[in-house]
From Swiss-Prot:
Alphabetized UniProt keyword annotations: Ribonucleoprotein, Ribosomal protein, RNA-binding, rRNA-binding
One Pfam entry name: Ribosomal_S11
Coiled coil: none
Official protein name in the record: Small ribosomal subunit protein uS11
GO biological process: translation
Entries under SUPFAM superfamilies matching the protein: Translational machinery components
Lineage: superkingdom: Bacteria
Alphabetical list of NCBIfam families matching this protein: PRK05309.1, uS11_bact
InterPro entries named in the record: Ribosomal_uS11, Ribosomal_uS11_bac-type, Ribosomal_uS11_sf
Molecular-function annotations in GO: rRNA binding; structural constituent of ribosome
Region (Disordered) location: 1-20
Length: 135
């Protein structure tokens, strides 16, 4: 008379990373006032690797520091080099404090930087900006 429970198979989904062999990639660095997100893509825009300061273990206000951006860029560069990336074009977006440090870290890791381009959007008188902080 008891209700029978259905057993769900909890098969482990093994995420296997397919090793691509890409020599030239595009690095997208989005640096906001709260976090730094780095995505490494191929020329078509398919993501090879990504990393953010939050996923690296930085919490709260430490995510927006240049040091967090440097560690995030090192981890993203290592993941990209596993796929054979030797040269990168860097696209920087945002006004955060980690944008310069992240771009410099890719050069320090031994990856040849072909170009650095700022793709931060400029509003054509769009949304009203937030009011100034008091203090």
């Amino acid at each position: 008379m008891g209700r029978q429970r259905q057993q769900r198979s909890r098969g482990s989904r093994s995420r296997r990373r397919v090793r691509k062999n890409i020599s030239t990639a595009v690095v997208h660095i989005k640096s906001s006032f709260n976090n730094t997100i780095i995505s490494v893509t191929d020329q078509e825009g398919n993501v090879i690797a990504w990393e953010s300061a939050g996923s690296m273990g930085f919490k709260g206000s430490r995510k927006s520091t240049p040091y967090a951006a440097q560690m995030t860029a090192e981890s993203a560069a290592n993941k990209a080099m596993e796929h054979g990336v030797k040269r990168v074009d860097i696209q920087v977006k945002g006004h955060g404090s980690g944008r310069d440090m992240a771009a410099r870290t890719f050069q320090a890791m031994g990856i040849e930087v072909l170009s650095i381009k700022d793709v931060t959007g400029q509003p054509h008188n769009g949304c009203r900006p937030p009011k100034r902080r008091r203090g």
